[in-house]
Amino acid sequence: MAPQNLSTFCLLLLYLIGAVIAGRDFYKILGVPRSASIKDIKKAYRKLALQLHPDRNPDDPQAQEKFQDLGAAYEVLSDSEKRKQYDTYGEEGLKDGHQSSHGDIFSHFFGDFGFMFGGAPRQQDRNIPRGSDIIVDLEVTLEEVYAGNFVEVVRNKPVARQAPGKRKCNCRQEMRTTQLGPGRFQMTQEVVCDECPNVKLVNEERTLEVEIEPGVRDGMEYPFIGEGEPHVDGEPGDLRFRIKVVKHRIFERRGDDLYTNVTVSLVEALVGFEMDITHLDGHKVHISRDKITRPGAKLWKKGEGLPNFDNNNIKGSLIITFDVDFPKEQLTEEAKEGIKQLLKQGPVQKVYNGLQGY
């Protein structure tokens, strides 16, 4: 073999050995850069989990493997210590670590029984009893509505576990016929039950990840299937988190628009001013006025409102209403005359119906 070909072969061999040692590229699997934040990682997992779930891809023989790779990538990159190990030593450095079930990871985002694709509610068999649904108000800030977030909720969930002994189950009403004599019968209704293994309810700690999507609206619900009240003879109900947006001290939400008030001095109102408003994510919205600003004047800043829930690329407006702070001290006669001379404005005392716009 020629020296040049031998050199190329060795380099290729080293590359292959390195790839095997390095293991899977978890960042590539999740489709995020190595600098990705935990929020980016969670968002990527949630999106891909819906796409790659084996139930959604029954004709793909690699669906299970892809889903397992996705779960492994999330488990490592969502844990700061495991991520540090992975960044330093690759997947080989994690071999001795504990690995979670990928189904457990999935249930943290969607609940115990997965989800119904296409957004349809799960179908309930009328013959199978079902526990009650639980609705929990989840308070979110306007900052979270603007930028999105993942909220971790820890709850103690009652879970049915096997216990010693037997119990009555599947009880139902049945008609019994008793012969009292020739041509005489008596019909009675009795409760008939089957005998089932005994169960007891045990509280187990569950951690759920609720994604607060940008632009989420008050009253929207995020369902977690099978996370509601248990039923010893059937299926548990669902848990639904209902969004409740808390009031903000600076901004008021109306649809996708944000409203706020700015108070300026009388001098600023007359001669103009410049200022910055700190937005919900910390960026500055610059305001520059070189005209007279009247009390109640409004300024529209397009694209500085909240993202639209259905299309985050569309944002509402920021509507700023100006208030003018007049001097609280009385003016001297000399100051009054000076203002009259400066403004050169005579009396304007017009009485009209302001509510009708006349």
UniProtKB/Swiss-Prot annotation:
SUPFAM superfamilies listed in its UniProt record: Chaperone J-domain, HSP40/DnaJ peptide-binding domain
One GO cellular component term noted in the UniProt record for this chain: protein folding chaperone complex
UniProt-listed Pfam families: DnaJ, DnaJ_C
Annotated keywords: Chaperone, Disulfide bond, Endoplasmic reticulum, Glycoprotein, Phosphoprotein, Signal
PTM description: Contains high-mannose Endo H-sensitive carbohydrates.
Signal peptide bounds: 1-22
Listed GO MF terms: misfolded protein binding; signaling receptor binding; unfolded protein binding
Keyword match Cell inner membrane: no
Glycosylation sites: 261
Modified residues annotated as Phosphothreonine in this record: 188
Keyword Disulfide bond (UniProt): yes
PROSITE patterns: DNAJ_1, DNAJ_2
Domain annotation J: ranges: 25-90
InterPro entries, per database record: DnaJ-B11-like, DnaJ_C, DnaJ_domain, DnaJ_domain_CS, HSP40/DnaJ_pept-bd, J_dom_sf
Any one GO BP annotation for this protein: negative regulation of neurogenesis
Localization (cell): Endoplasmic reticulum lumen
Subunit structure: Part of a large chaperone multiprotein complex comprising DNAJB11, HSP90B1, HSPA5, HYOU, PDIA2, PDIA4, PDIA6, PPIB, SDF2L1, UGGT1 and very small amounts of ERP29, but not, or at very low levels, CALR nor CANX. Binds to denatured substrates in an ATP-independent manner. Interacts via the J domain with HSPA5 in an ATP-dependent manner.
Function: As a co-chaperone for HSPA5 it is required for proper folding, trafficking or degradation of proteins. Binds directly to both unfolded proteins that are substrates for ERAD and nascent unfolded peptide chains, but dissociates from the HSPA5-unfolded protein complex before folding is completed. May help recruiting HSPA5 and other chaperones to the substrate. Stimulates HSPA5 ATPase activity. It is necessary for maturation and correct trafficking of PKD1.
Annotated protein name in UniProt: DnaJ homolog subfamily B member 11
